[in-house]
Amino acid sequence: MSSFLQVPRERWVASNALAFALRDTHPVSPGHTLVIPHRLVATWFEATPEEQRALFALVDEVRRELDGSHQPDGYNVGFNVGEAAGQTVFHLHVHVIPRYRGDMEDPRGGVRHVIPAKGNYLLGR
């Protein structure tokens, strides 16, 4: 059983027939939200095309809500697949991470910072 499936519906911030969204309990930034399929699948690659579409529809809905409630300056959106990529909960979830000017010294490179030395590939130019 997935811990996500035990979260009460009152904590959901959005949902559709195939997925739901809730705020991350260990947020990277204010508004950090997880979008999760109702069906327990470990990774994006195990989700059906319909589930993938439903997840991205909720990513859009969450982004619109966060634009109004948190006014971020940008977003990182993504998921981890496998332990080597940092996955610790083996129920697919898409991170919607609002980003704010000044939340890190130099954000260039975005998701490339998962390997810190590779983050800002422009530094050597």
Give names to the regions the model predicted.
Residues 1-125:
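HIT superfamily nucleotide-processing domains
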